[in-house]
């Protein structure tokens, strides 16, 4: 470690992204690494309409949830590096990732992008793209601002809430391609399924999905 790096560590100490504990190496402390709610076995993969498989490395609870809320709403964009690493490893271990042609993400509306300043799912997609060596492109667009899915009360409401919200980018070409769709959290899968439906209708041969975390059934 250089003198400059040592000074940086003193002024801006490295902290665990989940609990905030000051650590010397990595981005996660040993305690969190051991106790995080990892998905295992059949819990990793979900079957969703229009999606060949949706994989998630973590359950959305406790420290995982709190870290995600900081990432999404408190401008902790650097968290995308650690979250993206979890997601890329999950893809490597559970999907035929070498057959994936392009990575894309669930888009934000222009209104929400202006308010937040970044699309948390696209930052994750870019990180996964870099780790897997697969190109990342904006394939979809959000045509209108709908109610946040977290504010809906049922699976039926979630399906209705995303109907007609997304469409393909004008120059996007997915004909006979396999797409990896990136989102942050999956609950019922309504948003991912609707985006996958649009991609399949545009000619995509297969759509896989990966999220940072999932809710327990």
Where are the regions a protein language model picked out?
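Glycine-rich phosphate/pyrophosphate-handling loop used in enzymes and phosphotransfer proteins
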Residues: 1-183, 187-217
